[in-house]
Each structure stands twice: as structure tokens, then as C-alpha cells.
């Protein structure tokens, strides 16, 4: 068993690592079962948790130089990486415990785990037999989890010099960590589009599905839409939805001298046009914001709203269904959280219906904004 584990470490070190601009995704057709019940969702969830835990454990065997090489960085924040790994292990343990609650209905991927030691032990020896019902999923899943883990480790390695959603700066910031099991919140960034556009289609689709999502608008895009369509049309557009801000324009708010003005102008416009929809939250573009911004947001009565699951729908090399499959794989792994799409991307017209159809019988809930 120890030989197999260290062979895995060696193969990871030798293998080509995806570039930071190549988001990880997993072809869900390699999984042999549809998620047609809460128990089958749990089976797939247990498998993804163990596969990711295996990748996480392997990464811990790399020294600092090997990790730099793997992530393609000259310098890394080792403390931030260690903190992220600890958080991931805690969440994996909690998630596996939730996923085990249906083991009496289907025992696939149910192993003895009563704490962190036994979880790490099971992760170390996790493997899919060649004659397994799940063998077609095994290698694509291994590749997905290694690439996804590298995405996250790279963000931690650069934090806080380059801020991102990977960690919180303080109490004025939030993500979906504290949400209940099987509960997810849909969020959409960077709109609105001009009429008629994807924002129109999306808001109408969500209303038909009885889902209230959070839209984080750009002030300049909202102003252009307002100038063209008028206030009543904009109010009709966002009916039954929540509207936060992403700043006046889509740019990093970490080193921009006018970052406060960007937020205040956007908030003023949303509160003027959409007072009943206003959500006192700021979604930083790229997740980049100032480490010392907490006092400002506290003074404005606002929260910085980050995310747990990134659809990566702005990536040119990721198709709409690939984006949806990435989201579903991460929903199985993390079991709750905030999902980020962009309503400026036409991909969401395909990705979101695919996602809702794939999870319709899985016993999931969509958080009300």
C-alpha cells in the first residue's frame, strides 16, 4: 500500500500539469449512474470526496521546491497553502459524514471513517479496481481532482499578495462554508446585458423555476441598460431576484485608487432604481479586494460576497456543458456553497438547464437570495 501511494506521488510529479488558464472539468458521462435519488447523489459524492482527498494527500508529500514547480510559481505562500489544506480536510470529513448517512440504501464507497485519521487512511489507499462498475470514471476523475486542486493551491500560494476567493480577510466577508448540507446559492456576475440579452433570458428562466438568485451588477452596464430601456423595464427585468454590486466597471478593486467610489456609485444607482431588490453585498471582480477594506464595508453595512464553486464560464477553452459538468462535480465534492456564473455569457443558457435537470431528483435545495 505504501509503495502504491508513493508511486502515485511520483507519477504526479512527472505528469504534465494543466496551465492556470485551463480550468478543470470532468465528463459526467463517465459516471455510470444518473443522480436520480438523494442516495445516488451521495454515492457519487462519496466517490468524489475520496478521489479529491487522495489527490490532496499526495500533494502533501511534495516539498516546497516540487510544489513551486508543479504550480509554475517562483515563490509560494507555504502558510496559506497549509491553512487551505487544513480547511479542505475538515470540510471533506464533514462532507463524507453527511454522504455516509445513506449507506444503508447503497453501500458503494462506504468505508470506515470515524475521524480525520481514518479519512486520511482511506484516502491513501483509495483506488478503483480494473473490473469495477466505476472504472470508466476513475482516470478522468483523478485528472480532474489533480487539476482542480492545483487551481486552488495556486490561489493560496499567491494569497494575500493577489487576493481571491480562496480565503476570507475578516468578518465582513462571506462564502458558502456555513450553508447547510445539500443547499446551494446561484449567483451571476457582470451584468446586465443589453436588451434583449442573456440577463433577460436568465431572469425569466429563474422565475419559471421559482429560484431567487443573486445578480451582481456593474454600475456602468446597469446605467447603459437604464438609459436604453428605462426604469420600469429594469425593475421588471430583476423581478423576484436580488441585486448586489460588482463595482462600476469590471476591474480589480485591490489596487485601484477609486475603488470606494466605484462601489458607492454602483450602490447608489441600484438603490435608486431597484430599492426592493437591493442586496447589500459586493462581489469583487476576480475576487480581488484590499486586505484593509473591512472597515469601509462595515461602515456601509455591506458584506463582501465570495464564492465556493466557480463555473469558469468565461474561459474560452471551456464549453457550456463542460462548465456545467465542472459545477456538478464540485457540488458533489463540496455538497453546499455559493455557485458563480456570469449572466454576460451565453453559455449559461445551456449550462444552467443542464445542471438543474441533472440534479432535479437529487434532494438538493436552492438557497433563496
Regions found by a protein language model. Name each.
Residues 268-269, 329-330, 363-364:
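Short, intrinsically disordered/low-complexity patches at protein termini
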Residues 2-185, 197, 204-213, 335-369:
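Terminal accessory/targeting
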Residues 160-177, 253-271, 325-326:
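Short, composition-biased local secondary-structure segments
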Residues 189-190:
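Alpha-helical, coiled-coil/dimerization segments enriched in small aliphatic residues
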Residues 144, 232-233, 322, 326:
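Exposed alpha-helical structural elements
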Residues 176-178, 236-237, 331:
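Short glycine/proline-enriched loop/turn "hinge" motifs that connect secondary-structure elements
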Residues 116, 120, 128, 132-136, ...:
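Metal-dependent polysaccharide deacetylase catalytic core of the NodB/CE4 family, i.e.
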Residues 20-47, 291, 296-334:
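Active-site-adjacent pocket scaffolds in enzyme catalytic domains
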